[in-house]
Amino acid sequence: YQQRYQELKILTINKFKNSDGSFGEGSQSGYAFAIELGLDDPKKLCALFVEKVKKDDYVFNSGIFAMALSYEILSKYGYDEVIENWLLRKEAPSYQQMLKSGNQVLAELFVGEHLSLNHAMFASYQQWYYQGLAGIKITDQAVGFDHIVFNPYFSKKVNDFTCQLDTKQGQITSSWHRCGHEINWELVVPVKKVNYQIKINNRYQEIKRISKNNQIIIKLIDSV
């Protein structure tokens, strides 16, 4: 299978890669799938992906499958703020524009006339609550949530966030509170069953860490 993958990878690159580094029609979907399939250096492709989103006025305009990939990929490579700007966008097309209809549910499409007004087609943003804001990311070698990296996006748009996840290994919680430049982050992880790693962006200075049983409390200072 690996040999066949390499053959198809070379074929796809030769057929669809453009001189500017994009793939296919140069769409956001093209970047998302190229990164997921490992067609080029992911960090370089992700930077180009973000430039494309900016050119599109920060609107995520992929289809159902690439949209889901976009949240995971952009968060993985540190572009959570781009995701946040899109989710909080008020002008059409946007999620908030969908909700202005008053029916309190998402529609099938952002634009168009023939569509369902109650459809979960673009509800994949929910994964970002877990992977981005909570920072709970399973690693490639994980089986049943037994390998996790904690690396949350401490948004400046919200002051409190709590995420609780029931897994085969036990309950995992990531909860943080922001007060000015201070951030108090609390983790609950079944330490005897889960191989975990805590990653903190260089912009944050760790002041204090307390670990007791399955609970970890970390105090940070945001330098930006």
Predicted feature descriptions by range:
Residues 1-116:
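Catalytic cores of carbohydrate-active enzymes
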Residues 2-3, 7, 81-224:
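Non-catalytic C-terminal accessory modules of carbohydrate-active enzymes
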